[in-house]
Amino acid sequence: MAETAHGSSSAKSGAVGRHERLLDEIRVEFPSFEIRAKRGFPLQRAIAVALAIVTLGGQRGYLSRYHTVLFGKLYVSDAWKGMDDDDRYILLRHERVHLRQRRRMGDLTMALVYLFPILPLFVAWGRARIEWEAYIETIRATAEVRGLDAARALESEIVRRYVGPDYGWMWPFPRAVRRWFGDVIQSLEAEGRPRP
């Protein structure tokens, strides 16, 4: 599950951009892949209600801001329509990681790892690691599209998501998340990532 950034331009203008090319690659890799609007599916609405309840109202953006891969489909939030080409591209890079995790683990195993090790709330190591693998790709894609400074600027938001209610306080250890983040930035710096 990834939260949307802001956006405008090419996704709205109808120009074929990098996110469309990435979608083509994803559809080749995952032939049954589809993008669906979350609000159109009762299960997604039920998940939104359940998350709002178990997080004591802390996660109220599930339908409006967060996108979710479930059963090989990408369920997009209301924000998808307003995202520009770069935002969609970065999001799709993140979500493709989840599609690959699903293929590697299978639906049941991935759901169990996501929900239970160690606890469903507060210390969810399985969810933290699944999401971290995808957030590495978010950071890398951001650096590719917008430069290292933009990638560095993601730190506080990603830490907030890990230690806060968005993902059920999945890893409430900000120093650990900052260390993980720093490791990714260091690897990008070592690669000499050019500015866009």
What is each stretch, according to the model?
Residues 2-74:
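Auxiliary, metal-adjacent structural segments of Zn-dependent hydrolase domains
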Residues 12, 19, 23-29, 112-196:
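Metalloprotease/metallohydrolase-associated module, dominated by Zn2+-dependent proteases
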Residues 40-43, 81-82, 97, 106, ...:
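Short, solvent-exposed loop/turn segments at secondary-structure junctions
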Residues 48-56, 110-120:
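Short hydrophobic helices that act as membrane-entry/anchoring signals
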Residues 64, 71, 86-90, 115-118, ...:
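Alpha-helical hydrophobic/aromatic positions enriched in membrane-embedded helices and signal peptides
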Residues 74-92:
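Short pre-active-site segment immediately N-terminal to the catalytic Zn-binding motif
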